[in-house]
Regions:
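Alpha-helical transmembrane segments of multi-pass membrane proteins
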Residues: 17-25, 81-97
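Hydrophobic alpha-helical membrane-insertion segments
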Residues: 209-225
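Membrane-interface helix-loop-helix modules in multi-pass inner-membrane proteins
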Residues: 3, 22-36, 48, 149-196
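Extramembrane terminal tails and long inter-domain/linker segments of multi-pass membrane proteins
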Residues: 1-2, 48-69, 274-297
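Short aromatic-rich membrane-water interface segments that cap or initiate transmembrane helices
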Residues: 102-116, 171-183, 240-256
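Membrane-interface transmembrane-helix boundary segments in multi-pass integral membrane proteins
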Residues: 27-31, 111, 231-264, 287-297
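N-terminal membrane topogenic signal
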Residues: 1-11, 64-78
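Hydrophobic cores of alpha-helical transmembrane segments in multi-pass inner/ER membrane proteins
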Residues: 12-13, 35-50, 112-127, 184-196, ...
Length: 297
């Protein structure tokens, strides 16, 4: 059996296992999440399997550029479908919270945005580290492409959290451990982008940015565990692995769908941005000049 088939099978097994666990824990109430897990697991693992067999072919900017262009529409459409379905579940189907009323619905944006702010930073640090260790130009470009989207989601998490905090805490901001560490995350994103922009040599900029990204990764566990390590106003995790969610099934489904929509959006936008970075950095390469001639013609 080829490596591609093995990875594809593993992807389906993981997706099926996750869907089965949710089904037996919560029954048919989570059928939407089950379908999303199975479908996205199959699609994404199929793409991962494809790249595993063609890694060296697609590791160069020249080969990755057209491949990214073919992938963008798929992730963009997935993001659009998931966000429409997620918003419908979140604002039309999910019940009103008995304590917070309608104000709680901001969690359907706030919580997925907070998740994405951390996940994207880890992905950015990973690609930056790969670029630093293997001297891979494409990996460094991927890290650079992820940073702006990560900063946007971090800012979105902070703003929506402040709007949610006003009716809950009586103020828009407190120097809480969770809020402060999330604000530091925003500064890390901005610092990463500013540092790279301040260095003219792209290779030196990549190395400097990678060091900052890797050092800053220590902030991610601080954000996640801050509510456990310190006495904070911020509530605990909305979802705990191995523990059934306390929220209504439709609330959980809406939150997961919005998180998946944000993730698909991130991939689509990052691919668009990395194509622009490739063209900028490789503008003197022969294949880019040929591409320009073809587009003009």
């Amino acid at each position: 059996m080829s490596l591609k088939k093995i990875i594809f099978a593993l992807g389906l097994i993981i997706a099926l296992t996750a869907a089965t666990l949710i089904f037996f824990t919560h029954g048919l109430n989570y059928i939407g999440v089950n379908v999303a897990l199975l479908g996205l697991g199959a699609v994404l693992m199929r793409q991962s399997a494809y790249f595993s067999d063609n890694f060296y072919q697609h590791a160069s900017p020249q080969s990755f550029y057209p491949t990214a262009g073919r992938m963008i529409p798929w992730f963009a459409w997935l993001a659009a479908v998931l966000v429409i379905y997620g918003l419908y579940i979140s604002f039309a189907i999910a019940p009103t919270d008995f304590q917070q009323g309608e104000a709680y619905r901001i969690i359907f944006v706030h919580v997925p945005a907070a998740w994405m702010s951390m996940v994207i930073y880890l992905a950015m640090a990973f690609w930056a580290g790969v670029g630093l260790a293997l001297n891979s130009k494409l990996s460094a470009m991927m890290a650079q492409a992820l940073a702006p989207t990560g900063a946007i989601f971090t800012l979105l998490a902070l703003v929506t959290g402040s709007l949610w905090g006003k009716p809950m805490w009586g103020t828009y901001w407190v120097w809480d451990a969770r809020l402060t560490s999330e604000l530091i995350l925003l500064f890390l994103y901005l610092g990463f982008m500013a540092l790279q922009a301040s260095i003219d040599d792209p290779r030196k900029a990549d190395r400097a940015g990678a060091l900052l990204a890797l050092v800053g990764a220590v902030n991610i566990p601080i954000i996640y565990f801050s509510v456990k390590w310190w006495n904070t106003l911020h509530q605990g995790s909305s979802i705990n692995m191995g523990v059934a969610p306390k929220m209504a099934a439709t609330m959980f489904e809406g939150m997961i769908l919005m998180a998946l929509a944000f993730w698909m959006y991130t991939i689509a936008v990052a691919l668009i941005r990395v194509r622009c970075i490739i063209l900028e950095r490789e503008r003197n390469a022969g294949w880019v000049k040929e591409l320009s001639v073809k587009e003009i013609a």
